[in-house]
């Protein structure tokens, strides 16, 4: 009986381990993108009017001039978020108002980095095509991601923004 119970526990632990290693669908989508492309985001079920605000590595707040900066930064401050080795996506739904409409998704650093600082984009990105405008926060309806390469390290860079069609 004990070996059977031990085997059952091991199966449960292995299943839990497999679930925790599972990437979010959004992360899987970004990881599959090829450099030198601008693409729309997949439908993640976010309602119209939802804003997406990526935070890059070690970034703990949005720039003060960014749309929604006050609301998002108050949310991050209340959570005592300090940034770190991972990047995150702040999802701000139009309703409900306040903190209840904000969600923070965390993504482990992988084979790409997310940038949203204009100075870093200008310094590190190999190229930003004409017609693509990097944005600190972007609506799901207009959101596009640019995939480019870092000039010195050749890592993929993901930049959120809008594109002229």
Q: Could you say what each language-model-derived stretch is?
A:
Residues 19-70:
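N-terminal export/targeting and maturation segments
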Residues 79-105:
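Mid-length scaffold segments of soluble, non-membrane domains
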Residues 61-62, 97-103, 155, 164-165:
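Short, surface-exposed beta-strand/loop "edge" segments at domain boundaries and coil↔beta transitions
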Residues 1-17:
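Sec-dependent bacterial lipoprotein signal peptides
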Residues 114-165:
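C-terminal partner/receptor-binding element of secreted or periplasmic proteins
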Residues 97-121:
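Long, charged/polar, surface-exposed segments that mediate recognition or autoinhibition
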Residues 57-89:
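Surface-exposed acidic loop/strand-edge motifs in secreted or periplasmic proteins
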